[in-house]
Amino acid sequence: FYVKRENVVDAAEAIVTTQRDHGNRTERKNARMKYTVQTMGIDAFRAEVQRRLPGIETFPAKELKFDTVEDHLGWHEQGDGKLYCAVYVSMGRIVDKENGPQYRSAFAELACTLDLPYIITPNTNVIIADIAPEQKDAVDAILAKHQVPHADGMTATRRVAHACVALPTCGLSLSESERALPGVLDEFDTILRELGLENDPILVRMTGCPNGCGRPYNADFGFVGRAPNKYALFVGGSIAGDRLAGLEQKVVIRGDISATVRPYLEA
């Protein structure tokens, strides 16, 4: 259903509390909201959410089409006279990396000196919001000071790539994901630039096990962990997220990934 713009936060809270009260949080494999919807049925789930919105009018769902899953990285107008800056965060890790981006220090300094709010995106990037035009130079200076990369210099593939956390955090993981994908993307970048595809948004996702928390099954290239340093390769999804990929190879060794994907990119 749809709600008016001013009721969006209330609707989101109703959805979250419905999942909290009706979802199975004791069994991790059955904890996600999609299983709650499957168990209750979409009509019952919708009715429960609406019940939690007393006095708020809801409207029939409209047809909605997403053309991309890409975040609007970089600087953009917010629509109210202010700006927002969407910052690429490698694998979603807000940490200070040795000899690399100091994400944590940058965001801490921005919060302390400019008191700006943050929004975390589904692609695990960070949007710095409510920036006054006169603050733009200060934000740029702080990001540059802490070596936070500018998205303009990245391939379109790197901008949209995503991995689940996997090892060592997740006990279900069979192989690396978050810690492996940056290196895989380096290899992709080399091939993409060689073939002139650096501006084509080719969706690459990696997950540490078949549960697929990294959403590999609708990516152009999805790598699904099977065993240490071994992945199943799924090919043929889309940047719009509206097409499932198919299993191409049951096992690809980590060191063979670049050689395996090159023929697909050359085709």
Stretches found by the model and what they are:
Residues 1-267:
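Peripheral terminal and linker regions in Fe-S/redox and tRNA-modifying enzymes
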